[in-house]
Curated annotation (Swiss-Prot):
[4Fe-4S] cluster binds at residues 347, 407, 410. This is 3-isopropylmalate dehydratase large subunit. Pathway: Amino-acid biosynthesis; L-leucine biosynthesis; L-leucine from 3-methyl-2-oxobutanoate: step 2/4. It comes from the Bacteria. The gene is leuC. Catalyzes the isomerization between 2-isopropylmalate and 3-isopropylmalate, via the formation of 2-isopropylmaleate. GO terms for molecular function: 3-isopropylmalate dehydratase activity; 4 iron, 4 sulfur cluster binding; metal ion binding. Belongs to the aconitase/IPM isomerase family. LeuC type 1 subfamily.
Length: 466
């Protein structure tokens, strides 16, 4: 029987496997940030251990950083301590750090692919749940806890059980204006926020192949939001063209050899998946979440569902609770719902194509009265490229705030957050209660939809603005 891409990647990295034992995998890349690493480095220090492979470990500051100043003190005492600890730990253990003043600094899941640290066929881990992003390159990438961070630092290995396999095929062509964010939200709307639990998901189909690498990263970034361990897209010419010439990508003859190997990284025709889900891309409209998990999502032109319409009692109770928290009524359209803030950024949607899509809507328009809208590029290079293209001027002239790179309002760990009761159109990945600030209300959308909400003051169908 043939193997799935996941099974090939897993088997290629087994260091040791014995009966009744969890396999030990080799880890090719370890990405580190300031929040989940301090205790891991302390553990190494306490045991007198070194980082096993410092050349395969890369660190950056992203979660806590201010997006308004490069001052390490700007986000508060705990943030300052965590960032200073990262500086100290990376210097002591010989780990490459992209600190606040480094031109490549940015969100860990943006800079990894951008610099070519992320390559097909790799195993990649990070103390962050959205490590699945890197699976867009055909790498097995997943988030780990702090104790596992320490284990990888010390041994460059990790014990991992085998996951079940899921194929999500998106057939046909997406309509104009439909993005990877809309596709993945529609997928999660179909599977539910726990539909992928215990699985590694492979995304495939004509609509997936048509996505750019940045679109595929958005897709895999949110695999975790359906409960999956990781998300994968098999590498192809789109992948190779994106990677060629990047800092850590192979060069010259090594490049040719790498591409020859990478081209083998795909599921066999006779591979068996445990679960198969199919969607028609032509049926997908711009998506907006209405509840408090990414699976509570509808097309922008649909009505908010009545909790009584859910046959499952758990879903019914969850919907009722979500509507109460979000202060929404069933039967109304999201296009009638006003917003207070707009956030364009995060490891889901802060790359150059995302900013271009938002700027296209913002150009020649103004942010609605009473709305605060911020645009946070995902890295220094993204910010530089956007400014070279004049996107910063488009946003600023429209009334958006143009910020420095960082995780920003995706999570309430820095100064960018919602006040209680504020409603936000956000390009991030989680709409949980309090995710963007205590009692804040988060609606997940694409960058273009976020820009449309900013200039209209409410959720708007971006297809009507183009």
């Amino acid at each position: 029987m043939g193997k799935t891409l996941y099974q090939k990647l897993f088997d290629a990295h087994i260091v040791h496997e014995a009966p009744n034992e969890t396999p030990l995998l080799y880890i090719d890349r370890h990405l580190v940030h300031e929040v989940t690493s301090p205790q891991a480095f302390d553990g190494l220090r306490a045991m007198g251990r070194k980082v096993r492979q410092p050349g395969k470990t890369f660190a950056t500051m992203d979660h806590n950083v201010s997006t308004q100043t490069k001052d390490i003190n700007a986000s508060g005492e705990m943030a300052r301590i965590q960032m200073q600890e990262l500086i100290k730990n990376c210097a002591e253990f010989g780990v490459q750090l992209y600190d606040l003043n480094h031109p490549y600094q940015g969100i860990v899941h943006v800079i990894g692919p951008e610099q070519g640290m992320t390559l097909p066929g790799m195993t990649i881990v990070c103390g962050d749940s959205h490590t699945a992003t890197h699976g867009a390159f055909g790498s097995l990438a997943f988030g780990i806890g702090t104790s596992e961070v320490e284990h990888v630092l010390a041994t460059q290995t990790l014990k991992q059980g085998r996951a079940k396999t899921m194929k999500i095929e998106v057939t046909g062509d997406a309509a104009h204006g439909i993005t990877a964010k809309d596709i993945v939200l529609a997928i999660i709307g179909k599977t539910g926020s726990a539909g992928g639990t215990g699985h590694v998901v492979e995304f495939c189909g004509k609509a997936i192949r048509a996505l750019s690498m940045e679109g595929r990263m958005t897709l895999c970034n949110m695999a975790i939001e359906m409960g999956a361990k990781a998300g994968l897209v098999a590498p192809d010419e789109t992948t190779f063209n994106y990677l060629k010439g990047r800092q850590f990508a192979p060069k010259d003859a090594n490049w040719d050899a790498a591409v020859a190997y990478w081209s083998t990284l795909k599921s066999d025709d006779d591979a068996q998946f445990d679960t198969i889900v199919t969607l028609d891309a032509a049926q997908i409209a711009p998506q907006v979440t209405w509840g408090t998990n990414p699976g509570q999502v509808i097309a922008v032109n649909q009505e908010i569902p009545n909790p009584d319409s859910f046959s499952d009692p758990v879903e019914r109770a969850s919907a009722a609770k979500a509507l109460a928290y979000m202060d929404l009524q069933p039967g109304i359209k999201l296009t009638d719902v006003k917003i207070d803030k707009v956030f364009i950024g995060s490891c889901t949607n802060s790359r150059i194509e995302d900013l271009r899509a938002a700027a296209e809507i913002a150009k020649g328009r103004k942010v609605a009265a009473g709305v605060q809208a911020i645009v946070v590029p995902g890295s220094g290079p993204v910010k530089t490229m956007a400014e070279l293209e004049g996107l910063d001027k488009v946003f600023i002239e429209a009334g958006f705030e143009w910020r420095l790179p960082g995780c920003s309002m995706c999570l309430a760990m820095n100064n960018d957050r919602l006040n209680p009761g504020e409603r936000c159109a956000s390009t991030s990945n989680r709409n949980f209660e309090g995710r963007q600030g205590r009692a804040g209300r988060t609606h997940l959308v694409s960058p273009a939809m976020a820009a449309a909400a900013a200039v209209t003051g409410r959720f708007a169908d971006v297809r009507e603005l183009n």
